[in-house]
């Protein structure tokens, strides 16, 4: 886990509710951007490919299907995308034939595609060689757009994308989370181990 602001609260919660795994944390003392945080955490990454998830959003998908898709495509990078979102402040992803990513624009002024970046990525370790040589940088603005020349694919999911990046969206998501008609994959953990929100 890469943590920053309020990182102690996140580390404490996962320390108490870790289940059958040992969580590892990299605390960023200063903002590094999404890319800088991933680059700093790479010293702990042992798998190839490796999974990156945004911590302020939730989009349900089957990680095994994502991995099979990534492997079948021989992808260097795979991004989960959804059309089940009406917000304008998400990354816009254009897919071509065979789900190849043709463009990725973070929060464009004018949206010309229906696919939204779901904040879930699967990367081959070789992508690390493309990381910018700076301490603070954006995965969405500086790495993903340049990957369009690589085997970079979009994994389409019909799942809704929930963002808790603003106080208003957090309030909305808390209501959705409490709705018994909405199922989340972590609901049983939520009920057994206490509130995540």
Question: For the regions a protein language model found, what residue spans apply to each?
Answer:
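A short, conserved acidic/glycine-rich loop-to-beta-strand motif
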Residues: 73-83
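Conserved N-terminal catalytic core of the sugar/cofactor nucleotidyltransferase
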Residues: 1-54, 60-65, 130-133, 166, ...
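Catalytic-core segments of class I nucleotidyltransferases/pyrophosphorylases
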Residues: 50-51, 58, 64-71, 84-87, ...
């Amino acid at each position: 886990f890469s943590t920053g602001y309020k990182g102690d609260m996140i580390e404490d919660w996962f320390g108490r509710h870790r289940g059958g795994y040992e969580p590892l944390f990299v605390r960023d003392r200063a903002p590094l951007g999404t890319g800088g945080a991933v680059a700093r955490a790479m010293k702990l990454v042992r798998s190839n490919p490796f999974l990156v998830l945004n911590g302020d959003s939730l989009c349900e998908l089957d990680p095994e299907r994502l991995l099979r898709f990534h492997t079948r495509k021989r992808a260097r990078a795979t991004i989960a995308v959804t059309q089940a979102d009406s917000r304008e402040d998400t990354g816009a992803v254009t897919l071509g034939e065979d789900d190849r990513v043709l463009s990725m624009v973070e929060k464009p002024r004018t949206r010309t595609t229906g696919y939204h970046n779901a904040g879930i990525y699967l990367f081959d370790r070789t992508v690390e060689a493309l990381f910018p040589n700076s301490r603070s940088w954006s995965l969405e603005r500086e790495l993903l757009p340049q990957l369009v020349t690589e085997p970079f694919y979009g994994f389409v999911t019909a799942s809704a994308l929930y963002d808790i990046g603003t106080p208003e969206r957090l309030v909305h998501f808390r209501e959705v989370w409490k709705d018994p008609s909405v199922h989340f994959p972590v609901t049983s953990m939520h009920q057994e181990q206490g509130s995540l929100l």
